[in-house]
Amino acid sequence: MCTLVILRRPGHDWPLLLAANRDEIRHRPAEPPARHWPDRPAVVAGLDRTGGGSWLGMNDQVVVAAIMNRTGSLGPAPGKRSRGELVLEALDHTEAKSAAGALADLDPNAYRPFNLLVADTIDAYWLRHGGDGEIRVHTIPPGLHMLSDTELDDSGHPRIRSYLQRFRSAEIPDPQHDHWQAWQDLLASRTYSAEADPTAAMNLEERPDGFGTVSSALIAVPAYPGFASLPRWLHAEGPPDRFPFEPIDLKG
């Protein structure tokens, strides 16, 4: 049950900010974000060694893509392709709009259900495959939103119900000055309301089966990417209350 926080600010110097916690079985092998694919030299992404794809990535044209399993679809299944491939396929495109259009035409029956974010400085889309034989594309409006394993801003989802308003009320990061503290604190939070279960925490304690929060990310995309204004990506290679956020080298 990975979770994304998406802040869209059209017209701002930093129109796209993302925060993400990756929840996974801890023993599933993975590598931190880097240029892992020789046939895709423009892509920086985390590497899932089991499936060969990724859960979160960015290309040199600052298209960002992230994949989340939908409820009840954790892990691989016989006869299904890895959903991590979709992140890489999205990052083959130079614009989020063209990526969303191309991925919407894929055969949904080849994959287990997913939520896929594709965004850039201009547009942001949520591609929803709910297991009903169709991939639906939804535009994500300006403002702050959360997406996990159900619907965008789903008030019935324990984590979104617990944290959406907290993120909306928190101090907005200032990537220009590397100030992310409010969002870092929320990503690291293990608190949840008394009436909720532990999965409502933003940062999940590891369960007996090894499932929990295994890494965390903060991403900022500038309006005019270039040598003088590079995107920012901070990565915690473990639960963010125990591992520091370190910058990812995005230079080609």
Set out the residue ranges of the language-model regions.
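N-terminal nucleophile
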Residues: M1-G252
